[in-house]
Design a protein with these regions (language model features):
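Catalytic-site microenvironment of enzymes
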Residues: 1-286
Length: 286
């Protein structure tokens, strides 16, 4: 067993080295081309995570797919109102399932200048002890303590840090011919992420810049900052523009679930992301 694992790891390392060399020059060329030809933010694609039969995670009274759609639609309207020179495109406007490769495909076909995917975070269920007539029982309940926001860009993540990537990429399994769509990538195999992460996004630096601006805005309104992180996320990996996935809060946390479902909370989140876009747009167009 150890020998097999070692061989697989060595093969991954060899392929890692090859892919790094293969993609690095193309990445530099694509980035330079973007910076030299796209100096104006004209089109932004807003992606509401999950949808339809893919509800993903849920809280005590709400589902991620519904909250993500509400925030995505409000964000799109806010962009159209405040940035009249920007065209907004949605990957979905109703409760339907859109395949991950179709989401980024929409952005690429529309020649988008930014891709922003809206999601809710969640922690695994934990055991809770309760007593009935002197007898102890245990039940699984949402983790009530973890909270905050984090924003992801496409990139490499260590094996032990793949929880978010595995959860978000699980949507792939709902797609027909998913192995063909993602070049054999298996979202349930941790070793697949080593290679998948090497499909270097040409717009890493720009994506990190936008993600950092989003996190800064969250912090300005008192949110807990969990930082900007790189993950092998299928919805971002093949984007032909700066792309981020922002987790607007933990739906598994009772306080944050109420916040991200409230009109006030959603308005604040939308304003955070909008202001980050405005700041990013001002910077790249100057």
């Amino acid at each position: 067993m150890k020998i097999t694992t070692s061989k697989r790891f060595i093969n991954c390392l060899i392929l890692t080295t090859f892919c790094t060399v293969l993609f690095s020059s193309a990445t530099v060329d694509e980035t330079e081309n973007y910076l030299s030809t796209k100096t104006v933010i004209k089109t932004i694609v807003i992606d509401a995570g999950h949808g339809g039969g893919d509800g993903s995670t849920h809280g005590a009274f709400s589902k991620e797919k519904d909250v993500a759609l509400q925030v995505a639609l409000k964000l799109g309207k806010a962009i159209e109102k405040n940035l009249t020179d920007v065209r907004v495109v949605y990957t979905r406007t109703t409760d339907v399932f859109v395949q991950l490769y179709d989401r980024v495909g929409i952005a690429n076909r529309e020649k988008a200048d930014l891709f922003i995917s809206i999601h809710c975070n969640s922690m695994p269920l934990v055991s809770q002890r309760y007593v009935v007539k002197g007898k102890a029982y245990y039940r699984k309940v949402p983790n009530p303590t973890t909270r905050g926001t984090e924003t992801f860009v496409a990139g490499f993540n260590r094996l032990k840090e793949q929880d978010v990537a595995i959860r978000e990429n699980a949507s792939i399994l709902l797609e027909k011919n998913y192995k063909d769509n993602y070049d054999g990538f298996d979202p349930s195999d941790p070793e697949s992420y080593i290679i998948f992460s090497l499909m270097k996004n040409a717009f890493r630096d720009q994506s990190i810049k936008l993600a950092s601006l989003v996190q800064d805005e969250y912090v300005n309104t008192g949110r807990v900052n969990r930082g900007v992180k790189e993950q092998g996320l299928a919805v971002l990996q093949k984007a032909g523009m700066p792309a981020i996935l922002t987790e607007i809060g933990f739906i598994s946390n009772a306080i944050e679930e109420k916040y991200i479902n409230s009109d006030e909370g959603q308005a604040e989140i939308v304003n955070n992301i909008l202001q980050a876009i405005i700041n990013y747009k001002k910077d790249v167009e100057s």
